[in-house]
């Protein structure tokens, strides 16, 4: 396993730990999710380039599309919660109230 793969795996793990530990604010959760998606994108792109898989070359672009959709939905939810409640705490996201 090369050093770049280890760094990307470590970035993914740190983002996952950040998502699990700092769940009080919604903005920090969204940033951790974006870090996870970015590290997955880099790992997937490097794997496809190193193995010369031409059939799977669209997978990183599809992952970027899903990451953009996740970011747009997360930011719209953040704006809705912060304008409604005045803060971005995750405790405000009760499914019975939405």
UniProtKB/Swiss-Prot annotation:
GO terms for biological process: ATP synthesis coupled electron transport. It is a multi-pass membrane protein. It catalyses: a ubiquinone + NADH + 5 H(+)(in) = a ubiquinol + NAD(+) + 4 H(+)(out). Its main location: mitochondrion. InterPro entries: NADH_UbQ_OxRdtase_chain4L/K, NUOK/Mnh_C1-like. It is found in: Mitochondrion inner membrane. The chain crosses the membrane at residues 1-21, 29-49, 61-81. One of its GO terms (molecular function) is NADH dehydrogenase (ubiquinone) activity. Its EC number is 7.1.1.2. PANTHER family: NADH-UBIQUINONE OXIDOREDUCTASE CHAIN 4L (PTHR11434:SF0), NADH-UBIQUINONE OXIDOREDUCTASE SUBUNIT ND4L (PTHR11434). Core subunit of respiratory chain NADH dehydrogenase (Complex I) which is composed of 45 different subunits. Belongs to the complex I subunit 4L family. This is NADH-ubiquinone oxidoreductase chain 4L.
């Amino acid at each position: 396993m090369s050093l770049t793969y280890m760094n990307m795996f470590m970035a993914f793990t740190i983002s996952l730990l950040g998502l699990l530990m700092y769940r009080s604010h919604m903005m920090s959760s969204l940033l951790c999710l974006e870090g996870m998606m970015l590290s997955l994108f880099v790992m997937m792109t490097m794997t496809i380039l190193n193995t010369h898989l031409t059939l799977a070359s669209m997978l990183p672009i599809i992952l970027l599309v899903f990451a953009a959709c996740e970011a747009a939905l997360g930011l719209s939810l953040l704006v809705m919660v912060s304008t409604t409640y005045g803060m971005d705490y995750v405790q405000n996201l009760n499914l019975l109230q939405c």
